[in-house]
Amino acid sequence: MESTDSSGGPPPPQPNLPPGFRFHPTDEELVIHYLKRKADSVPLPVAIIADVDLYKFDPWELPAKASFGEQEWYFFSPRDRKYPNGARPNRAATSGYWKATGTDKPVISTGGGGSKKVGVKKALVFYSGKPPKGVKSDWIMHEYRLTDNKPTHICDFGNKKNSLRLDDWVLCRIYKKNNSTASRHHHHLHHIHLDNDHHRHDMMIDDDRFRHVPPGLHFPAIFSDNNDPTAIYDGGGGGYGGGSYSMNHCFASGSKQEQLFPPVMMMTSLNQDSGIGSSSSPSKRFNGGGVGDCSTSMAATPLMQNQGGIYQLPGLNWYS
């Protein structure tokens, strides 16, 4: 088959298009508004698709012959028969061949209130060399052909009996496949994985900030499965220290106030049980003061201080 160098000859005329114009037609639009009009010799909406016999060129020569396009290129091309009396198209090119892949996809038109098959879309891949030992390339072709071709008359069949022309026009979209999309997808998933790891690490740090309780501060009421208030406070100054749980005892009656503060922060005094500047006697705790003293201690002692959006107990250094 004759080969033509893409570097020779004048470049195809460029269409007069407005700035920012993009050509991204659907399959239906390609068949109805371009291929069908071309086959019927009707003027096209815009002269943006060049007439090129694709099988006389290798795919890397075609972008220079296109009227428009940067990443994909559109052409009107004739199709020839592989054998004079057969219906198989000739897919041979200059230094290789086009091989069909997958099954034909119907092009459906939804205009007029119904669905109608108006064309067929076929996907092909270019192979360098000769079949069946060709080397697969990244060049892809989408070939569109009409399905409503008029039946061939007997006289026409006699005139075309020795002709190799199978179709006067098919519409082809050519592009080169690359791995940039897959690479970007993998890169995106990698970043998501890293972000999740950092998020989990930050949450572990925040959890450890509250999990590692300083020595001398105990939480049997929080981490115990026993809901009996008498098991939490034994009425004396020993054990876990009654003053440390005066808040929990006050809210044990079912008041809605127990929902306002996390259990880990329900302490009236951080100096009790820790041995830091406190000489309070058991008489000032539950066994000496009763529930009324509990309410008084709640009003007199600031429970939490807002530091940077985190409520902390006064007198306790969470970061030591």
Swiss-Prot record:
Composition bias, Pro residues: 9-18
Any one GO molecular function term: transcription cis-regulatory region binding
Coiled-coil regions listed in the entry: none
One GO cellular component, as annotated: nucleus
Localization terms from the record: Nucleus
Domain free text: The NAC domain includes a DNA binding domain and a dimerization domain.
Protein name per its UniProtKB record: NAC domain-containing protein 18
Lineage: Eukaryota, Viridiplantae, Streptophyta, Embryophyta, Tracheophyta
Gene name of the record: NAC018
